[in-house]
């Protein structure tokens, strides 16, 4: 009899690890966090790691390439985290397409997956410090950029579904849904900002080439995984 862990089960555990860690429903079952990652558990402490304390720009401020540069760099950083997990999953599946025979290796993958939100946060902090931007400036630019790019909640839900299927491989029957909550509030704000006329034509033109890039490489940021200390995802067949 084969002994191991079905890939379907392991992938379900990976999803649980990704979305459950910040809410502390999953992580305590495993070893202590790596020392270099542990400081990124709480948003207040994460914000304190950003050197610049510049305030949110005024209502008259407009997006420029310089303003969106941190968001684009953070999207690349978060995408690199996802790609590493995808690579690890592919390596585990390579020997046998239906069974992970090394349960220990599978559990190591789950442990890695639970670190994704913290690694994304670390990447954002590094980008902001490299570019001398504050968290308040990042929040402003992100909200305005998403509004100007015409990205809606529906777009993000579709992109998230595509990301999970591409990354996790054999979850094609699974549906990934993020409850309304803070994510819904954020997209109601961006929709309202877009509809209000506060975004000018130059900003729409600026973001047009980056819309698909954000949907392809910045899904975790579009879901706000770096910006909240609790995050829920519902996985259903």
List the model feature ranges, each with a label:
Residues 48-49, 115-121, 182-185:
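Short acidic alpha-helix initiation/capping motifs at coil-to-helix transition points
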Residues 24-90, 94, 226-237:
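Immediate post-signal-peptide N-terminus of mature secreted/exported proteins
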Residues 96-158:
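Mid-length scaffold segments of soluble, non-membrane domains
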Residues 1-4:
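Positively charged n-region of N-terminal signal peptides that target proteins for export
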Residues 21, 192-237:
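A cross-kingdom marker for long, charged
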Residues 7-25:
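Hydrophobic membrane-insertion alpha-helices, especially the h-region
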Residues 131-210:
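A charged, solvent-exposed segment within the mature domains of Sec-exported extracytoplasmic proteins
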